[in-house]
Amino acid sequence: MEPNELKRALGAGLLSFPVTPFDDKGEFNPDVYGAHIDWLSGYDATVLFAAGGTGEMFSLSPDEIPNIVATAKAASNGVPIVGGCGGGTRVAVEIAKGIEKAGGDGILLLPQYLIDAPQAGLYAHVKAVCDAVGFGVTVYNRDNCVLQTETIQRLADDCPNLIGFKDGTGELGLVRRITATLGDRLTYIGGMPTAELFAEAYLGAGFSTYSSAVFNFVPQLACDFYKALRAGDRATCENILNRFFFPFMDLRSRQKGYAVAAIKAGVRLQGFAAGSVRPPLTDLTSQEVDILAGLIEPWKQ
C-alpha cells in the first residue's frame, strides 16, 4: 500500500489494535489470531494494528512480529494491517524491514525502550526507520519519544513516507500546536489508554480518529460510540461513557498493565482462546473477570 493511501485509510474511520493470542506454552497462536482478525474485520475499523501496544509488542521478539503481521494480513479480508515496531534504532529498522517483507501495509513506530533522548536524537531515530522502508510510517508520541513541533515538522519535511502522528501524552496544548502547524500533512490519531475517554477533547484538537482497544471484544459498541462522536451526538456519547467506559476505566485502573490485560480478558469472554498476557504483565483475577463479564453482557456477541 502506498503511503498516502494508508494515510487516507487511517483518517477514514475507527482504528484498533488486536490482542496477540498465546497458547498454554506462551507461544503465538496463529489459528486463534486469524479467527479473531476475521471477526473484527467484519466491523467498521478502517485499519488494524498487528503487534501494537495492546498486542504486547513490548513482549514479542523481533522475529515473531513479521509472522504475526502476515497472519493478520491473511485473515483481514482486505482491511489494511499496520505492524508495531520499536526498540533501539537498529532493532526498529530490522523489525520495520521484516514487516514490509511480510506484506504489512505500514508500521506504527512505538517509543524506544527505557532511554530518554534529546530532540536531535529522536529525529535521527525516526528518520532512520522511515529511510529503511518504502511504506507508510506513523510515529507514536508518548513516554520516551515526545516530539516537539519543530521536530515533527522537520521529519515531515524530510521523510515523505511519514504519514501519521499518534499521541499518547494527553498534552493538548502541544498536539494542538502540531496540528495547527502541519495541517493535513499527517493523519492525527488519538492514542491515550481507553481513547474514548479523551476522544471529544482530541477531536477538538484536530484529531479525526483514535485507536479503540475495546473494539477487540465489543466492536459494535466501539463503532456506535465513534459514530456518535463524529455526528456530534453528545447525549449518546455520554450514555455509553456512563454505562460502559467509566466502569471499565475503574476496572482497568486497579493494576498497572490492566490497559492490556483487561482487553485480553474481554476477548476471552467473547469466546476466543487468547490465552494469558506475557510477563511482566499479569492477568485479571477471577473476581475481576466476573466484573468485566457483567459489564460487557449487554453487548455480548
UniProtKB/Swiss-Prot annotation:
Organism of this sequence: Allorhizobium ampelinum (strain ATCC BAA-846 / DSM 112012 / S4)
Descriptive protein name: Probable 5-dehydro-4-deoxyglucarate dehydratase
Family annotation (InterPro entries): Aldolase_TIM, DapA-like, Dehydro-deoxyglucarate_dehyd
EC number: 4.2.1.41
Signal peptide per UniProt: none
Alphabetical GO biological process terms: D-glucarate catabolic process
NCBIfam families: KdgD (TIGR03249), PRK03620.1 (NF002958)
Pathway in which the depicted protein is active: Carbohydrate acid metabolism; D-glucarate degradation; 2,5-dioxopentanoate from D-glucarate: step 2/2
Chemical reaction(s) catalysed: 5-dehydro-4-deoxy-D-glucarate + H(+) = 2,5-dioxopentanoate + CO2 + H2O
